[in-house]
Amino acid sequence: LFFFLILEIHNAQVTGLDGWDLFIDPGHSQDENMGINGYSEAKEVLQVGLELMNILNSESDIDTVYISRTNDNQSVSLYQRTNYANTVSASWYHSIHSDASSNPSTNRTLLLWGQRNNGEPDPPVGGEEMSSFIIDILTQGMRIETIGSWGDCSFYTWSDYCENSGGPYLYVNRNTNMPSQLSEQGHHSNPAQNQLVMNAEYKRMLAYLFFWSILDYHDIPRPQVGKLAGIISDIESTKKINGATAQVN
């Protein structure tokens, strides 16, 4: 159904991330937030997080990559996640999620960065700028619609939490000591999207979208990509084809 082809292009390790580290937080735990086709948000985002960790460690000179959980059996609280990141003094915190809607046709990306109730970014700043890179690259790579990049207090207008507390709204933005943001990579309540994320290569593609966003934020040239991704369909029936072979000339 989905293919992600890596061409044989050998690149030197990306440099420029030395001295910088990242805390990856795959949202939720175990089998939480079940998708419409039976594949949960928790399992989806864990695999994307692990792929991103592997890409950063193998293809860049990043100092350290931390991750809040490493398997589907762990149950990790919000406090444990943020406390871990604060304890290791991570340079950056990124929380990976997928979204849900009562409308199964809805499928969009969203970035949420820490914001004070007065509209200013929550210090230390950086989440807003990083989110501006991620939202464009993630949306273009997934080829779906987007809600955009928002400060969390501006987004959750139905709640008076920011007004009463000063913000930020999201726990992971409010309780981390480093710049942070949370991403929503489409909707697991969308049948087609939930099926796509069952594919390991699709999740690897999502991880590369985050990797390229990080490089762009740091003004580091991307290596030659050498990757093709897509869904193969029958030209007449438009039905998706499993087990197809793609040839690149």
Per-segment meaning from a language model:
Residues 23, 95-106, 113, 150-222:
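Active-site-adjacent mobile loop/cap segments within catalytic or ligand-binding domains
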Residues 244-249:
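Short amphipathic beta-strand segments in non-cytosolic proteins
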Residues 29-40, 100-131:
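A short, glycine/acidic-enriched catalytic loop
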Residues 222-223, 229-242:
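Structural motif
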Residues 28-31, 71-75, 98-103, 116-120, ...:
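Solvent-exposed loop/turn segments at secondary-structure junctions
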Residues 14-84, 88:
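Active-site histidine-acidic residue metal-binding/catalytic motifs
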Residues 6-9:
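N-terminal signal peptide c-region/cleavage motif recognized by signal peptidases
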Residues 127-164:
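Active-site-adjacent substrate-binding region
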